[in-house]
Design a protein with these regions (language model features):
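C-terminal "post-core" interaction segments
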Residues: 1-21, 30-261
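Short strand-turn motif at the edge of the Rossmann-like AdoMet-binding core
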Residues: 27
Length: 261
């Protein structure tokens, strides 16, 4: 994806500066492409190697049987659907597959500060979980959603009039230590309410200010508490967006669908 390359370029600038601490703001990131999660984590892991496991995947019975079948193994002899390793290149499909070297800063990083919220979910949590075994990850903000499962898209592609599809939960993912115990979300090391008083990126914004104080060792100046804009930021969303989020959050701990009917 284009944004993977843009992120890679930004990390490349940090690499030139030999940074030791990184702040990653995931508080409004509901997730996305697994490939992007792998690419991003590959930019941050120490001693990057394609032999290192980023995540393991456990599927429901139907998918497990299929991936273990002789037909799958004969058709895809080089595929391992049960684990994903870190990547040294970002592969973008085009008329031909283009490969771009990953800009990795893992060997200079001492720790990562993740700014989190109750909207941090799925692939965002996957990045946190996947990096935890390799370097210190400090969370600042609110507890994350706790979506350690994944789905697959099912629709009737042959029917041109079809406008419906569904995405059943069919897998759970783990980090390299086989840890996946965050169905109630990652609890932050430092709980701080979201700061609606300051713009994102403002060094006085509550969560970022806390991260900076942890990096510099200089206590953040006390400030007047930001006014409460909403009881919940989700209530400010359009109905469809809020409804979509609630579906993700409420179904996050539902396990595998094994029925064939």
């Amino acid at each position: 994806m284009k944004y993977d390359l843009e992120l890679n370029a930004a990390i490349g600038q940090f690499k030139q500066q030999n940074i030791t601490d990184l702040v990653v703001d995931l508080r409004y990131n509901h997730g996305g492409m697994m490939s992007s999660a792998i690419n991003f984590a590959s930019m941050l892991v120490p001693n990057l190697s394609t032999n290192k496991v980023f995540s393991y995947t456990e599927y429901n019975r139907n998918y497990t049987d299929y991936f273990n079948s002789s037909s799958f193994k004969s058709n895809y002899p080089n595929e391992n659907p049960f684990s994903d390793n870190f990547a040294t290149t970002i592969d973008l499909p085009s008329p031909k597959t283009d490969k771009f070297p990953v800009q990795n800063i893992g060997n200079s990083l001492q720790r990562i500060y993740f700014l989190t919220g109750d909207g941090t979910a799925s692939a965002s949590e996957m990045v946190i979980n996947g990096l935890k075994p390799f370097l210190p990850c400090i969370l600042i903000g609110d507890t994350t959603v706790g979506k350690n499962v994944g789905s697959t898209l099912i629709n009737d592609e042959k029917n041109t009039k079809n406008q419906w599809a569904f995405m059943p939960i069919v897998l759970r993912y783990f980090n390299k230590d086989r840890q996946s115990d965050f169905t109630k979300g990652f609890v932050p090391n430092y709980y701080i309410e979201d700061d609606f008083k300051h713009q994102l990126g403002d060094i006085n914004e509550g969560l970022l200010a806390k991260a900076i104080s942890q990096i510099t060792g200089v206590a953040q100046a006390s400030a007047a508490k930001a006014p409460i804009v909403h009881q919940s930021w989700k209530k400010a969303l359009p109905y469809k967006a809020e409804h979509h989020f609630l579906i993700v959050k409420n179904k996050a701990t539902d396990l595998y669908i094994n029925r064939t009917k």
